[in-house]
């Protein structure tokens, strides 16, 4: 994709970059209204996820994570921007007349053909079961439960690796560094999700961040004691604790938040590293 760099005429345009070729032109049958009213609050109106609120209105695009159009070739017609995710999406026209959106694989261009099913070619954008893939294949949009659609490695630039197959299970290395077992009957898409450098793109100004629904981040040390354990004091005061904590008093620099005795504990061979 072509990246347009702004000429530095104001402080807000310094280092600002946008994608000049990716537009949003959704199809009416593949979108519906998305009413997001929580803004980081729970049913009682209490903030449970900070720094969320505002943002531009959005229409949700129906993404085909299941890839259940078996053995029917499809053609990439457009590559579009999706306001609901960092990755781009592709509009696919299948041979039977079906039209669907899928995640844009890295390197795919308009006019490429894709297919899903068993014993299909190991080609970027094709979807097939893990049992039919060779070891070392880079994959994304991976199912956890057979037939439920892809759940893992769906963010921009995400990619997992098939490292082993034994018995009824396949061993995958996920983008987080976690190594876990998944049924070989589950399907995945070959390749890496596109828009790899999205985290390195500079928005240029605070207003662009607000359009995405992300509000300013405030340090706890400048808050009042009622709002944060670090708050209070006269002037610039230290936090008054041995270690920093979250607004709810939990250790801020590392605390295990995973539920104990979760059903998938036996499937995880190595913990994630990030």
UniProtKB/Swiss-Prot annotation:
Main location: plastid
Any one of the GO CC terms: chloroplast
Record bears the keyword Ribonucleoprotein: yes
Key words, A-Z: Chloroplast, Plastid, Ribonucleoprotein, Ribosomal protein
Single GO molecular function: structural constituent of ribosome
InterPro entries xrefs: NA-bd_OB-fold, Rib_uL2_dom2, Ribosomal_uL2, Ribosomal_uL2_bac/org-type, Ribosomal_uL2_C, Ribosomal_uL2_CS, Ribosomal_uL2_dom3, Ribosomal_uL2_RNA-bd_dom
Region Disordered, annotated ranges: 225-274
Location(s), subcellular: Plastid, Chloroplast
Keyword Transferase: no
GO terms under biological process: mitochondrial translation
PANTHER family with a match to the protein in the record: LARGE RIBOSOMAL SUBUNIT PROTEIN UL2M, RIBOSOMAL PROTEIN L2
UniProt subunit comment: Part of the 50S ribosomal subunit.
Entries under HAMAP family matching the protein: Ribosomal_uL2_B (MF_01320_B)
Annotated family: Belongs to the universal ribosomal protein uL2 family.
Name recorded for this polypeptide: Large ribosomal subunit protein uL2cz/uL2cy
Gene behind the chain: rpl2-A
